[in-house]
Structure formats: C-alpha cells, structure tokens
Amino acid sequence: MAKFSKMQVMAAMKETGMVPVFFNKDVEICKNVIKACYEGGVRVFEFTNRGDFAHEIFGELVKWADKACPEMILGAGTVVDAGTASLYLQLGANFIVGPNFNPEIAPVCNRRLVPYSPGCGSVTEINNAQAAGCDVTKVVPAGNVGGPSFVKNVMAPLRWSNIMVTGAVEPTEENLTPWIKAGVLCVGMGSKLFPKETVAAGDWAAITAKCQEALGYIAKARA
C-alpha cells in the first residue's frame, strides 16, 4: 500500500521540481544513492523496473526508506503493463511511471488513488492520458520529441497540464532553466545525475552535492 497520498506525491513533485531515476541490482548501492539524494533535498525518487528481481529490490527499499528516509516518496518506473503495476503497488509504490501510455494501467492505479504518469509524445497522447485520469504525464524522450519548445507549445492549448520530462535533461543551469521556463511540473534525471564512475567509486557526497545544485537551479528558474 502507498504511504503517501496522490495529493502529497504531486505536491512534492511540484515543490522540488526533480525526480531522480535509478536502478541497480545491488540493493546496498540503491540505498546509498537514495540516501545521498535525500540528503541533497530530493523528496521524490523513481526506481526503474529494469533488471531481474527488480521488484524484490524495490520491496526492500520501501521497508528501509520508511525509517532511513521517512519523507522520501518512492515510486516505480519503466512499468508497461497492468500486472507489473499491480505488483509494485502491492509492494508500496507511491506512484507508477511508464515509457508509454497503457490504458490498462490507469484503472489499476486509479482504484487505489495512486498517480500514474505515462510516457507521451504528442498532444493527443497527453490528452488521452489525462482523460484516463493521469494527472501527471511524462514527455519522453523529451529531447527527441522537441525539447522545451514542445512543452511550451503543449501548455498553450492544454494549460491545465502537469508535465514531467525525461531524456536530454541534465543537472546544469543552462539545461534546466529552459525546461522550467517552458512550464514543466518537474524533470526526471538518471545517468547525468548518477554518472557510472561516481556510483562505482561510492562517491555519495558528490551525488548529494549535484542534487543540491540542480534543485537550486530549478528554484532560481522559478523565481
């Protein structure tokens, strides 16, 4: 069961403006990354379903985070079917994210009032997802779809939209500012926030610092 309500999840996404995206088969590495992000000010974290036994790792992380990072909102990403969504919801996912829009996932999440953020690449897909009850839609791959200008042009006719972008998003002021100015609710970041060499070296302090910097750039762009 989800620990946080849909309202709390969306409020945290809006307040911080950033959702780190990560997967590693080593649960201890995952814990260290999540803790580093938490200490850097992150409050929403997407664990991606991208490896064998990923759901088992996620279940362990949810139990651990409840005490180690009590305000961290953990969700599951790379979910493409209703069965997998149900599995992660049972393990405590507070939100579900997918690279595509699957209308079969929406009612599974809606029944439990858990946010479902599907990947969309057009105004039609975004609006169809909204009609299915998706409060936050994800534009992916954001860089290929059209960048900040695409988001800005979507927000013109669909002013009520809450858009998350992933792909071509980097933790730099030059990159983040255009996305925020375009009107996104939040940005998702993976490899740019967690370089392989940083994770391999166990330099968790560097991840904390990078999160702090990115959140600072987002706040500045919103000011």
Show which residues each predicted segment covers:
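Helix-adjacent hinge/juxtasegments
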Residues: I73-G75, D81-G119, V123
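Glycine/Thr-rich beta-alpha phosphate-binding loop at enzyme active sites
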Residues: R43-D52, T84, L89-L91, R112, ...
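Conserved N-terminal beta1-alpha1 strand-loop-helix module at the mouth
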Residues: M1-G75, V79-G83, L87-L91, K181, ...
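Glycine-enriched alpha-helix->loop->beta-strand junction motifs that scaffold or abut catalytic
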Residues: Y38-R43, L89-I96, N110-S117, A131-V136, ...
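Hydrophobic faces of well-ordered beta-strands that scaffold small-molecule active sites
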Residues: G17-F22, F45-F47, L74-G77, I96-V97, ...
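Catalytic cores of alpha/beta
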Residues: D81-L91, T124-G133, E170-V187
